[in-house]
C-alpha cells in the first residue's frame, strides 16, 4: 500500500507521490515569535515532526522548511513595551522556542528561514504581482493584493467571494479598493521604531519605507527555499483561511503555477472542551506543561490523536497518556530489546505501516504497538521487544530506558528502593515469605510497585 494523505485542497485522501521521485519538499508555517510557545504550537510542530519521521522511514529524502515570522505587529508592540530592539526580542524568543521543542524531542527542520532575511525576495514578488495587475498602491500608501482579480480565490477554504464579502469577519480597512484585499507591503508610520522599517528604494523598488505583510513572507520564503511548486504545504487549521488562501493567490498569481500539490492541516487544541485562550485562564505554554509531565508523555498524548482531529487538553488525558506509556515501557523492561532492523513484511510491522500510510494514522499505529507489547509480555522475546522499540522510533517514542521512565517520580531514592528489593530477595531465598511480603507491602504503601520476572525484580511508580 502506498502513502495516502488527506489534501485540504481536494477535500479527499489522495495517493501521494512526490514531484521528484524519492524526494519530498515540505513547507510548514511556523511561529510568530513574540512570546513563549504554547501547547497549540507544540501540537502543530509535533504533527509535522511525525510526518517528517514517517516520510524518512518510508525511504524519502526530505527537505523540510519551517519558517519563523520575526517581523509582525505583535512583535513590534512587545519589543516597544519591553524597551528592547526587535532583533533582541526575536533572538530571545527563538532561543526559547528551540529549547522548548528540543525538550519535546521534535526533530529540527532542514531549514528554518527568518522572514527578515528574505525581504528582497518579498519585494520582487510584489513587483511581479504589480506587473500582472494583481497589486496596487492604496490611498494609505500600502501595497495591496486585488483579490477579485485572482480567479481561483477561495478554492482552498471553499469560500465564495460573495460569502466572504458578506461575512462579519471581513473588516473594511482604509485605503483598499475592496474590503477583501489584503496588504502586501505596509507603509511605515512615524510612531514605529526604525528597526521595523525597510527602505524599498534601496532594494530596487518604489514602495517607500515599510515592512512586508504576513502573507507575502511565506510565499516568498517557500518559493526561494523549495521552488515555485513543491509537494506539501502544512500548518494549523486556523491558517487555512485567510493565510494559506492568500499564499495561493500571491504565489500562483506571481508564478502562474500551483504552489503546493498537497495542503495538510492539523486540528485545534481545546482545554477541557473549551477554546484555549489567555482570557479564559486556560492558556498553557510548553514550559507550563513540562513542569507537570515529562516530554514523552506529552508526545504520546498529542500523537495518539489523529493529527486532523481536535485535541482536548486536560490533566486527566495527560495522566491517562502517562499510564498508557507505562504499559509499553513495562513490556520493554521485561527483556533487553535486541537491535532490530524493521522487516515490513512482519505482521506487526505491516499493520503499523498500513496505519501510517493511511494519512499518518497514529491512533491505529499506536494500537499495533500495544498488541506487540502484549506479545512481549507473553513471550519475553528480545526480538519482539526490539521491533517494539524500532517501530516506536518512527513516532519518536520508546527510546528511553524503561527503568528510568517507570521509576520517575518515586518518593524514595533509587538506592533505598534497591536495598529493600535486595532484602526481599534474600528473604525469599531463605523461604521467609512473610518478610518478603512485608517488604512488598511497605514499598506499595509508598507508591512503589514491584515487578518480578526471570531477569529479576524491577519497580515502577504506582499509577
UniProtKB/Swiss-Prot annotation:
Tell me yes or no: is Cytoplasm among this UniProt entry's keywords.
yes
Gene3D superfamilies this protein is in? Cysteine-tRNA ligase, C-terminal anti-codon recognition domain (1.20.120.1910), HUPs (3.40.50.620)
Q: Where is motif 'KMSKS' region found?
A: 275-279
Q: Where in the cell is it found?
A: Cytoplasm
Query: In the record, what terms sit under GO molecular function?
Result: ATP binding; cysteine-tRNA ligase activity; zinc ion binding
Instruction: Give me the segments passing through the membrane.
Output: none
Give the location of motif 'HIGH' region in residue numbers.
31-41
**SUPFAM superfamilies, sorted:** Anticodon-binding domain of a subclass of class I aminoacyl-tRNA synthetases, Nucleotidylyl transferase
Q: Name one Pfam family in it.
A: CysS_C
Please give the superkingdom of this protein's source.
Bacteria
Keywords carried by this UniProt record: Aminoacyl-tRNA synthetase, ATP-binding, Cytoplasm, Ligase, Metal-binding, Nucleotide-binding, Protein biosynthesis, Zinc
Ligase: present as a keyword of the record? yes
Q: Which CDD domains match?
A: Anticodon_Ia_Cys, CysRS_core
Could you give one GO CC term from the UniProt record? cytosol
Task: Name the EC number(s).
Answer: 6.1.1.16
Give residues annotated as binding ATP. 278
Name its co-factor(s). Answer: Zn(2+)
Q: Which residues bind Zn(2+)?
A: 29, 218, 243, 247
GO BP annotation list: cysteinyl-tRNA aminoacylation
Q: Reaction(s) catalyzed by this protein?
A: tRNA(Cys) + L-cysteine + ATP = L-cysteinyl-tRNA(Cys) + AMP + diphosphate
Subunit composition and interactions: Monomer.
State the similarity comment: Belongs to the class-I aminoacyl-tRNA synthetase family.
Protein name, UniProt field = Cysteine--tRNA ligase
Amino acid at each position: 500500500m502506498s502513502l495516502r494523505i488527506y489534501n485540504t485542497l481536494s477535500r479527499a485522501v489522495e495517493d501521494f507521490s512526490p514531484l521528484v521521485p524519492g524526494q519530498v519538499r515540505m513547507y510548514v508555517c511556523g511561529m510568530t515569535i513574540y512570546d513563549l510557545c504554547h501547547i497549540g504550537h507544540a501540537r502543530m510542530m509535533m504533527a509535522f515532526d511525525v510526518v517528517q519521521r514517517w516520510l524518512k522511514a518510508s525511504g524519502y529524502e526530505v527537505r523540510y522548511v519551517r519558517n519563523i515570522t520575526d517581523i509582525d505587529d505583535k512583535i513590534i508592540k512587545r519589543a516597544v513595551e519591553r524597551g528592547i530592539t526587535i532583533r533582541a526580542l526575536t533572538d530571545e524568543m527563538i532561543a526559547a522556542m528551540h529549547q522548548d521543542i528540543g525538550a519535546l524531542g521534535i526533530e529540527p527542520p532542514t531549514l528554518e528561514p527568518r522572514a527578515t532575511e528574505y525581504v528582497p525576495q518579498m519585494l520582487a514578488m510584489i513587483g511581479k504581482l504589480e506587473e500582472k495587475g494583481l497589486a496596487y498602491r492604496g490611498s494609505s500608501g500600502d501595497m495591496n493584493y486585488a483579490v477579485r482579480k485572482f480567479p481561483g480565490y477561495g478554492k482552498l477554504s471553499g469560500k465564495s467571494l460573495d460569502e466572504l464579502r458578506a461575512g462579519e469577519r471581513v473588516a473594511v480597512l482604509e485605503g483598499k479598493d475592496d474590503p477583501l484585499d489584503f496588504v502586501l507591503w505596509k507603509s511605515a508610520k512615524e510612531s514605529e521604531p526604525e528597526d521595523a522599517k525597510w527602505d524599498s528604494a534601496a532594494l530596487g523598488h518604489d514602495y517607500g519605507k515599510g515592512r512586508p505583510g504576513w502573507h507575502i513572507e511565506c510565499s516568498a520564503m517557500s518559493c526561494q527555499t523549495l521552488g515555485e511548486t513543491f509537494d506539501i504545504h502544512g500548518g494549523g487549521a486556523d491558517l487555512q483561511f485567510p493565510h494559506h488562501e492568500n499564499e495561493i493567490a500571491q504565489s500562483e498569481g506571481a508564478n502562474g503555477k500551483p504552489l503546493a500539490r498537497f495542503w495538510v492541516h492539523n486540528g485545534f487544541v481545546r482545554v477541557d472542551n473549551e477554546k484555549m485562550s489567555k482570557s479564559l485562564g486556560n492558556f498553557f505554554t510548553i514550559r507550563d506543561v513540562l513542569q507537570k509531565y515529562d516530554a514523552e508523555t506529552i508526545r504520546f498524548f498529542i500523537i495518539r490523536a489523529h493529527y486532523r482531529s481536535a485535541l482536548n487538553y486536560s490533566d486527566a488525558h495527560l495522566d491517562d497518556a502517562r499510564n498508557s506509556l507505562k504499559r509499553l515501557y513495562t513490556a520493554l523492561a521485561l527483556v533487553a530489546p535486541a537491535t532490530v532492523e524493521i522487516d515490513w513484511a512482519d505482521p506487526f510491522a505491516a499493520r503499523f505501516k498500513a496505519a501510517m500510510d493511511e494519512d499518518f494514522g497514529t491512533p491505529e499505529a499506536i494500537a499495533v504497538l500495544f498488541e506487540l507489547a502484549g506479545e512481549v509480555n507473553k513471550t519475553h522475546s528480545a526480538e519482539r521487544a526490539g521491533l517494539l522499540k524500532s517501530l516506536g522510533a518512527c513516532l519518536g517514542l520508546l527510546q528511553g530506558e524503561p527503568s528510568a521512565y517507570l521509576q520517575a517520580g518515586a518518593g524514595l531514592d533509587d538506592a533505598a528502593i534497591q536495598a529493600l528489593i535486595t532484602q526481599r530477595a534474600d528473604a525469599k531465598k531463605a523461604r521467609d515469605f512473610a518478610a518478603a511480603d512485608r517488604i512488598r507491602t511497605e514499598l506499595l504503601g509508598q507508591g512503589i510497585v514491584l515487578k518480578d520476572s526471570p531477569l529479576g525484580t524491577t519497580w515502577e511508580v504506582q499509577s
